[in-house]
């Protein structure tokens, strides 16, 4: 939200200002909010190299997430695009404080690498929900649940916002979560 207010360039400059980070966290705490959501539109595998991610993108984001966690605020991050090459970086957080929602990331690897400490969320493709059959949608959801649910820490949902989904596919997504998503 701060990015919407400040604009992208100002936000990038502000990330170096630890006082601004402290003031922002204090305002979040004062508001009673216990989760902060981050849409990560520019960190995916195709936007920058792993070396660039490691040097420029990840250190400041990790620092911000840890500052929130230190203040008792959970971080929920939406990873637009593919984060397959980022998974090894993004899971080193205290257990139960960080949620990663994925759009086009290999969910088996995401669960394997992140699932011990972080909640993994996603990634039923919006194209499947918009254009797929009911049977294909249910089968995709079943496989995702079988892959990601063991051990807990998984939420079945769309990979991105779904604005054009077929109602019957949304219904079958919910039915599949009730049928296959029961922890035993």
Write out the residue ranges for each language-model feature.
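Active-site loop segments of alpha/beta catalytic cores
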Residues: 1-184
């Amino acid at each position: 939200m701060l990015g919407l207010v400040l604009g992208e360039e100002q936000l990038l400059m502000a990330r170096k200002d630890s006082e601004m980070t402290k003031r922002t966290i204090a305002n979040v705490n004062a508001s009673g909010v216990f989760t902060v959501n981050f849409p990560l539109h520019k960190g995916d595998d195709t936007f920058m190299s792993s070396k660039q991610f490691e040097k420029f993108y990840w250190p400041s984001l990790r620092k911000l997430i840890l500052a929130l966690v230190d203040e008792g605020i959970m971080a929920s991050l939406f990873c637009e695009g593919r984060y397959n090459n980022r998974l090894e970086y993004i899971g080193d957080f205290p257990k139960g404080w960080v949620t990663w929602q994925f759009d086009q990331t290999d969910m088996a690897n995401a669960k394997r690498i992140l699932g011990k400490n972080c909640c993994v969320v996603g990634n039923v493709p919006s194209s499947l929900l918009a254009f797929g059959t009911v049977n294909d949608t249910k089968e995709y959801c079943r496989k995702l649940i079988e892959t990601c649910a063991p051990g807990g820490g998984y939420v079945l949902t769309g990979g991105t916002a779904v604005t054009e989904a077929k109602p019957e596919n949304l219904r079958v997504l919910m039915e599949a979560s009730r049928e296959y998503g029961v922890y035993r």
